[in-house]
């Protein structure tokens, strides 16, 4: 019987280690931080867009807190055929190929919200949306798969546009339009995209 030399054993061990490393990396999750509200330098200006653009009187504000985190809050009114308030990020121009979902950490008020995504920056661009419901006063992480986002325009579902294209993300945001009048408050820590490589 031939006994392997010490050099051969070292080479074999190194090869096994390399193979294990490649396997683990292949299975490792992809994660890309889009906004970290715990760090002010990573929280560029966000813009509120409410139903006053169509005659409504809902109000909202978005504030990045000095001690970390951000808050989207306001009052939804159903008067004048209104009923929504929203906030969206400054243009980000992200290529999220390799990811398959958005994940964010928020603390809400028990109301239903939507996470919104645009792939174009124009005012008349489609708005892709996916719903999530918060638990009052509890911090939660919500994961919304790209495939579950529905293209809309001014509240109407579009059937003649392609699915969300993760390679061309122009902006993201939050929307409340649950047809319930009254105050709302959504605190947030961060927004990221995740997935596993093919």
Language-model-detected regions and their locations in the chain:
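Bacterial N-terminal signal peptides
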Residues: 13-23
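Beta-rich carbohydrate-recognition modules and glycan-binding surfaces
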Residues: 2, 24-198
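Bacterial N-terminal signal peptides that target proteins for export
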Residues: 2-14
């Amino acid at each position: 019987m031939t006994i392997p030399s010490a050099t051969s054993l070292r080479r074999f061990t190194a090869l096994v280690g390399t193979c294990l490393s490649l396997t683990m990396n292949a299975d490792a999750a992809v994660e890309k931080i889009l906004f970290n509200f715990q760090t002010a330098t990573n929280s560029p200006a966000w813009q509120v867009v409410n139903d006053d653009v169509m005659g409504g009187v809902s109000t909202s504000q978005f504030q990045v807190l000095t001690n970390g985190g951000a808050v989207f809050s306001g009052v939804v009114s159903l008067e004048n055929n209104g009923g929504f308030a929203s906030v969206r990020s400054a243009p980000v121009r992200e290529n999220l190929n390799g990811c398959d979902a958005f994940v964010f950490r928020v603390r809400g008020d028990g109301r239903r919200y939507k996470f919104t995504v645009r792939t174009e920056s124009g005012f008349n661009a489609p708005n892709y949306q996916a719903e999530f419901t918060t638990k009052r006063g509890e911090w939660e992480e919500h994961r919304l798969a790209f495939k579950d986002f529905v293209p809309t325009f001014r509240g109407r579902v579009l059937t003649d546009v392609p699915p969300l294209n993760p390679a061309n993300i122009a902006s993201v945001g939050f929307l409340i339009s649950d047809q319930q009048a009254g105050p709302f408050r959504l605190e947030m820590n961060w927004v990221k995209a995740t997935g596993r490589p093919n």
